[in-house]
Amino acid sequence: MQGQAGIIAKFIDKEQIDKPLIVGHSLGGAIALALALEYENKISGLALICPATQTVDKVPDIFRFLNISSRLLRFFLAHTFSSLFGILTRKDTFEIAFSPEPVSENFSIKGGGDLALTSKAFIKTSEDLVFALSSAPLLVGREKELNVPTKTLFGEKDEILDVKLHGEKFAELSGTRIKVLAGKGHMLPLTQPEECSTFIRSMMDETST
């Protein structure tokens, strides 16, 4: 994650962006957090949506097939069974990711869900997951080093990341704020776009003053 944070920091410099607010969802939230810890002078704040903020001891079932450390095995599966497995498990995977909310209408096409069926997507997603699991311990325990305005939005019924661990514990350790949406799940950017928009805009207003 530190490597990806470094890429974003270089992009900010190259484009001469003046301290942007960084928004991150799920694993993107972990990358945003790494950016804030390593390059706090380049950003104005964080708006985190259902972020992965703590070490994951148990990989969620829908990602277990992606947790492959061997590059050779990853390449083999990507070009043989991954698409078939993805098709067979697509319905259950989507339902778990969105639970307890309904899957967004036509998520496979309009939401890009079926893009995950490609060999290239399988390889990159697997790499990201493995790298995230290995680098997460380097961030955990540094919550008190967070020096930029930060607020977290979480779904109370998130089945991918535990709100108490990744949301409430993180907020307590870092001294930052959290808003929990009752009865909502992990895919808030798609199921609760108005809530997310209001959340992000409020942080933009706060960090631009």
Task: Kindly label every feature range from the protein language model.
Residues 150-184:
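Conserved loop-alpha-helix segment in the C-terminal half of the alpha/beta-hydrolase fold
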Residues 1-23, 59, 198:
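Active-site loop/oxyanion-hole signature of alpha/beta-hydrolase fold enzymes
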Residues 24, 28, 32:
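Gly/Ala-rich beta-loop-alpha elbow adjacent to hydrolase catalytic centers
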Residues 37, 46-79:
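Flexible "cap/lid" loop of the alpha/beta hydrolase fold
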Residues 21, 44-47:
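Residue in the alpha/beta-hydrolase core beta-strand immediately N-terminal to the catalytic nucleophile
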Residues 13-19, 40-41, 147-148, 175:
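Active-site acidic short loop of glycosyltransferases
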Residues 82-145:
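Conserved alpha/beta-hydrolase catalytic His-Asp/Glu region
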